[in-house]
Amino acid sequence: LIVDIAKKQNPAVVFVTSKKKFQPARGNLPQQRKPFRQPSPFGQPGPFGSPSPSPQQPGPGNGTGTGFLIDKDGYILTNNHVVDNADVIKITLDNEKEYEAELIGSDSKTDIALLKIMRQPGDNTNFPYLELGDSKKVEVGEWVVAIGNPFGLDHTVTTGVVSAKARNIGAGPYDEYIQTDASINPGNSGGPLLDMEGKVIGINTAIYSRTGGNVGIGFTIPINMASDILDELKKDGKVTRGWLG
């Protein structure tokens, strides 16, 4: 079953590379004291707290991560921290074909970004894509599959189970992470977590680790959270929320 899922869904998972003209210098907080208050182990500022402010340093900076196609027209979901402040975003498909991508919309509060592949004139490719599932139906203990690009090793497939639901890790007001022991590492960020039907149930986002490597505790944004804001990201490029005042 897992072999079938990997063969069928791998072509819809993409390698995301972001290039920045300026890369912020970031300091690391002591990992032993505050393992949740360190820069994200995925190599970009992630949901485990904000690094200490520091001036911009001249010079190029590159970020890498994962994304996945959600329709035949080339829309891609990934993490906001993978492409945040990027000047150029490049997508590499399973067949090694490269495209530039446009940032359609992003939401830092949920760490979700929507990209779209920029086609050349006359390119009518129907891209392979993943079907979005229902994360409300996810059960603790069910098997899951993660696909991503850990350490640049593209289209790596790992398996595990759902370890917990609605996990709060102190990242913000939208903490409802799915916890999994499927192996995810730097470069997996933005990739899909799939159920045994091959449907996306979450976006792999972060890990708990004192070393920066996988220890079997990964966190995934429930896909329903992305589905809820998808239309708004397409239309407005951002999410507008109400407030009391």
What are these regions (language model features)?
Residues 1-245:
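Serine-dependent protease modules
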